[in-house]
Amino acid sequence: MDPLKLENYLTFRAIIRGSTLSPGFFRRWCFPALADVVGNIVVQEEGRFWQILPENHAFWGLLRRGFTVASFTEIITAAQLENERLSRQLAFLAFISFLLRNWPSDSLVPEADRLDLVCAPAWSRMQIWTQTARLINDLQDSVLEEQGSAEEEECEEALLAGDSDDPLFG
């Protein structure tokens, strides 16, 4: 169950990469369609993202000094991004793009490495959400099947026993 159709890491990476670019022809036609959607969400939600992670937050200092893996895992886990308009996954993609767009320019991390340093833990988080949703769906389906088969058995027993309320079968 993957409503965003993120089949693999390369697709995910291309969407994040495209969403960091300015709106226009290049982003719209050279990257997956979701990149343009995510890029537009970043623009719309930028104020809210700055409230979640203000400019004076210690996270930006960690990025500046090159500490990325532990800090990303902490931010990704702690941030409550979804709201009534955005699903958790879309808000998450937009937040990742926001982080890349606002990465401190004086960071020790080379610009070429930033995308993968952000996308790898983000992709792992997305996979966990997808697998969890799939497990919940499978569990709900099996519960519904069990309830349905139990009701069918009760109906069969009632018909065989002749104690049905239906006048034709009574």
From Swiss-Prot:
BP term (GO), one: symbiont-mediated suppression of host apoptosis
InterPro entries documented for this protein: Adenovir_t-Ag_E1B_19kDa (IPR002924), Bcl2-like (IPR002475)
Pfam family, one: Adeno_E1B_19K
Key words of the record: Early protein, Host-virus interaction, Inhibition of host apoptosis by viral BCL2-like protein, Modulation of host cell apoptosis by virus
Family, as annotated: Belongs to the adenoviridae E1B 19 kDa protein family.
Identification of the protein by name: E1B protein, small T-antigen
Organism: Canine adenovirus serotype 2 (CAdV-2)
